[in-house]
Amino acid sequence: LAFPGLTPFEEVFQLKAAHYIKYTNGKLSEIQYWKPQKCKKIHYQEEEQYKDLVVQTFRKCVEDLLRPGTQIAANLSSGLDSTSIVSIAAPFLEKRGEILHTYTSIPDEAHDYESDAYFVPDESSAVKKTVACFPNIKSHFIDCKGENALTHLKKFVEEYDLPIKSAINLSWIYQVNHDAHARGCT
């Protein structure tokens, strides 16, 4: 973190992961309740068993967040993170007869993107391939043509009480949140 412990609120600080604060006799003390280096090590015979455990743990983490009876939405790029989450969430929701709304940014064609061999400004074709694998995904492609980070700034500040990390994506974030809210998504 660039500024460990700091939050956007005056005199409100963030604790380190796996810590809590104890107040005793007028003194604050920070106590670590979990130490990853002290966890029991797992020893398997086969490499495949480690892979299975990672997938099983990841699957449980994703599925535990999918509350029944609500519309679920996810941001979907062609990256590993969002694609992995969507690839687990979609079949799980399909078993419950539910759909998954996904949101993908479509870049402004007028913008001059850097020519970098690893930079993909328009990820929509790869996203469409992912979406094609899951019949219960309803994909939404958000075009912020002619907008920039300042377009929705005033409305954003009025509606959200916290700063965001990637202000360059503010217009897209604002539109996704409003569209998802209108659809009843969480």
Predicted stretch roles:
Residues 1-45:
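N-terminal segments that mediate ammonia production and transfer
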